[in-house]
Amino acid sequence: EVKLEESGGGLVQPGGSMKLSCVASGFTFSNYWMNWVRQSPEKGLEWVAEIRLKSHNYETHYAESVKGRFTISRDDSKSSVYLQMNILRAEDTGIYYCTTGFAYWGQGTLVTV
């Protein structure tokens, strides 16, 4: 059974920082690109960041709205992907999901700024 479990959300003041984590199981994590996406009533579903494989030198890509503020990383030995979020803004509020190229999804973690 494939599982993705996010954690680390909560309430943070504007300008603050927060780190999200996602632990995967049930598939070969190191073989999958990983993404963070978020959902809010105002913007709907919005892609946030992507990290590719070791063979791609863990190349990363970001939405323009978070570039320079958010950092995605992964630890294949722990089947985990992370999202470090700095200089948070009210518009970053939403439910954050990790996903494997949109095939598998976690349950999400709520971030409120």
UniProtKB/Swiss-Prot annotation:
Keyword set, alphabetical order: Adaptive immunity, Disulfide bond, Immunity, Immunoglobulin
Gene Ontology terms, MF aspect: antigen binding
Xref: InterPro entries: Ig-like_dom, Ig-like_dom_sf, Ig-like_fold, Ig_sub, Ig_V-set, IgHV
Keyword Disulfide bond recorded: yes
Residue intervals of the Ig-like domain: 1-113
Cystine connections: 22-98
The protein's name in its UniProt record: Ig heavy chain V-III region T957
